[in-house]
Amino acid sequence: MGGEDYYLELCERPVQFEKANPVNCVFFDEANKQVFAVRSGGATGVVVKGPDDRNPISFRMDDRGEVKCIKFSLENKILAVQRTAKAVDFCNFIPDNSQLEYTQECKTKNANILGFCWTSSTEIVFITDQGIEFYQVMPEKRSLKLLKSHNINVNWYTYCPESAVILLSTTVLENVLQPFHFRAGTMSKLPKFEIELPAAPKSTKLSLSERDIAMATIYGQLYILFLRHHSRTSNSTGAEVVLYHLPREGACKKMHILKLNRTGKFALNVVDNLVVVHHQDTETSVIFDIRLRGEFDGTVTFHHPVLPARSIQPYEIPLAGPAAVTSQSPVPCKLYSSSWIVFQPDIIISASQGYLWNLQVKLQPIVNLLPDKGRLMDFLLQRKECKAVVLSVCSQMLSESDRATLPVIATVFDKLNHEYKKYLDADQSYTMAVEAGQSRSNPPLKRPVRTQAVVDQSDVYTQVLSPFVENKEMPHKFVIAVLMEYIRSLNQFQIPVQHYLHELVIKTLVQHNLFYMLHQFLQYHVLSDSKPLACLLLSLESFYPPAHQLSLDMLKRLSTANDEIVEVLLSKHQVLAALRFIRGIGGHDNISARKFLDAARQTDDVMLFYTIFRFFEQRNQRLRGNPNFTPGEHCEEHVAFFKQVFGEQALMRPTTF
């Protein structure tokens, strides 16, 4: 399998820590994404490493028994360590605060602490087998204050730090889940819900395992992911992942079912809003995108893998230290190892090898694995880093080797412009709201974020259409059809078409002498009026004489003042066109000779300069009976230049009758 075929990879720079062994225990904190390596209960050192930490945190603590759980509060201000089932110990890591440990026992009598979660830099939740206790930690007083508690029988729990939701498993079958949400000193109880267990014979006792539940945010919404090893319907083989949507308000609802079509050991990650399911037996993974169209049965949507199953890209463990200098080759990493542990959303840890990786999606290989261009675009436009790949797909579908049909090209352009229009509308609404003084509204207005899915006209023009038009091998009819298809799509979404796209169409038509088509496009307003377009038409007069009149008509429709038209033409170095225009409206006796001679000089075309100079000499002769310029016209430098280039004898002599 070529390297271009893998669409999942482990990050290049993993967090490296001391491998787990009888002396060294390894813990992972899902909130701070930190790995703790605790040697000899902390007596010979604790090393804490996170993905963004340039400098690991190292410290020692007294060995007061086996460490069951160890985590820093957010911002690494307070360390919490659980050594017994009854209490949690705390130690301040704040400058000028006492570093003496202080302890908090759980309030409920006879309860055992299953674990704890920090929800902020000074708020912590104890989860016991009899409920939860929410505390505020006061580091300066070295004590805790109980904010709220709730009694409920708990089998196990899981925590989603991104949304600050704790899920408690209750009842004998362990499948009734009770969520709690934490925010700024408050604890809210959300409606409990039941996870449907697979159908099973009466003799077997099925219960919900903590291993088969994950919580993750997908497309901004919180979901509970349940790995159901056997489908509820007996005629269906293989496992499935059931997604329950957990809203901030209202009941949890089953929304999606991801069909795995295989059985065995699975693990789940969420990367870039994609659900990744790893299968240990085949050492492959598949990805699901719940935004892509699935099969809806009236209640839930069924999804199949977006792509064929593939292994994560082979990974070599980089050598460090003196060994890296020798000829020793890097060691291939054992992928899908039984020692791998996955954490949400995108973390894979190998405790036996001492590595923490972030899982990543590679978009470029997917282009060749998903032949349906419409579905490919739907998929790519939802990804964070999609712009370069989206533009490469557009270029590829216009290339000779992979040329797509016009309906497919139209579909792709429509999908791009749908996202583009969504952003333009949101941005306009925001601007109008700010201008109307609603910027201090509650909740405060947020400027829409321009994601990489917003591919605008300049992106398509620069990266796709310009190179495409320059390819001389392309049939010109196809080129024009593609350009018009993009303009059609922009018009359909009511996006004003930029003049440079119209210019590209006109230049292509002129290049292939398709003047009749150009005339039709202008006549039926397929190409929108604009000043740059009118100037371009004027410059085409020598190839296509009617272009002059078409241009003037356009400028008049735009209500452009005559002197402004002249300025526009001169700025575009269309000196002759400007002169023809001014003669056409009878204003040539009053124009500034110097302005036209300046413009002619700037073109570096001496014959053009000669023509313009001669025109004004003739005008002077006609109006004043003398070809020479008057001092008031300030043309001395141009007369000197004319003499220098053409000689004094080339100047007109006054005509006498």
UniProtKB/Swiss-Prot annotation:
A GO cellular-component term linked to this record: Mon1-Ccz1 complex
Keywords annotated in UniProt: Autophagy, Endosome, Lysosome, Membrane
InterPro entries assigned to the protein according to its UniProt record, in alphabetical order: RMC1, RMC1_C, RMC1_N, WD40/YVTN_repeat-like_dom_sf, WD40_repeat_dom_sf
Stretches assigned to the Mic1 domain: 471-637
Family as reported in the entry's similarity comment: Belongs to the RMC1 family.
Known partners and oligomeric status: Found in a complex with RMC1, CCZ1, MON1A and MON1B.
Lineage: Eukaryota, Metazoa, Chordata, Craniata, Vertebrata
Subcellular location: Lysosome membrane; Late endosome membrane
Swiss-Prot/TrEMBL GO biological process terms: autophagy; regulation of autophagy
Species annotation: Mus musculus
Tissue specificity as recorded in UniProt: Highly expressed in heart, brain, spleen, lung, liver, skeletal muscle, kidney and testis.
SUPFAM superfamilies: WD40 repeat-like
Name under which the protein is recorded: Regulator of MON1-CCZ1 complex
Pfam annotation, one family: RMC1_C
Function summary: Component of the CCZ1-MON1 RAB7A guanine exchange factor (GEF). Acts as a positive regulator of CCZ1-MON1A/B function necessary for endosomal/autophagic flux and efficient RAB7A localization.
